[in-house]
């Protein structure tokens, strides 16, 4: 086995490095043990691709910064457009919902109380007028009574009559 090692070294030294080294396969006649030859980096050559020397390193950095700046400006413009559209949409919605926001239930309650009082007075005055006419002997149809002004209470009266 030791006699084989110098032969391998002489074989490596006799062959010049090529792109495809000629390796002879081991045959079974040489011995029962198979030996593998290892190749050193000096004997094999790889594709000799080199990175070109960048003479203008600042130009590459400048191009990269320019592209980054353009992308940033486009991104900011898109963000501003989306922000403005959102503000306009919210403003439009606010104007549509403004009557709901300005609703004050206390003011509405005061108006309803006034109408109820007026309606009660009108009903009391109609009953008083009807009883006065009955005592005087004049009969009038309900349709001939004093005209009532229409109010929102008509709807509440109908609702109260339904629930009663």
From Swiss-Prot:
UniProt entry tagged with the keyword DNA-binding: no
Stretches with biased composition (Low complexity): 24-45
Cross-referenced InterPro entries: C3orf18-like
Membrane topology of this protein: Single-pass membrane protein
Coiled-coil annotated residue ranges, if any: 106-130
Alphabetic keyword roster: Coiled coil, Membrane, Transmembrane, Transmembrane helix
Composition-biased stretches (Polar residues): 1-17
UniProt keyword Transmembrane helix, yes or no: yes
Any GO CC annotation of this UniProt entry: membrane
Transmembrane segments: 64-84
Compartments where found: Membrane
Region annotation Disordered: where it falls in the sequence: 1-48
Protein name as annotated: Uncharacterized protein C3orf18 homolog
Source organism of the structure: Mus musculus
């Amino acid at each position: 086995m030791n006699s084989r090692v110098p032969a391998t070294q002489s074989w490596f030294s006799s062959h010049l490095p090529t792109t495809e080294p000629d390796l002879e396969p081991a045959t079974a006649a040489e011995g029962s043990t198979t030996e593998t030859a290892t190749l050193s980096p000096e004997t094999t050559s790889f594709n000799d691709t080199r990175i070109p020397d960048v003479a203008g390193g600042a130009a590459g950095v400048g191009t990269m910064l320019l592209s980054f700046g353009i992308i940033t400006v486009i991104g900011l413009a898109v963000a501003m457009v989306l922000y403005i559209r959102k503000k306009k949409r919210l403003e439009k919605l606010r104007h549509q919902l403004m009557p709901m926001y300005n609703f004050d239930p206390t003011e509405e309650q005061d108006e309803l109380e006034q109408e109820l009082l007026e309606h009660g007075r009108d009903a009391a005055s109609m009953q008083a007028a009807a009883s006065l006419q009955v005592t005087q002997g004049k009969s009038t149809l309900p349709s001939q009574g004093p005209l009532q002004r229409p109010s929102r209470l008509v709807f509440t009266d109908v609702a109260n009559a339904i629930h009663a």
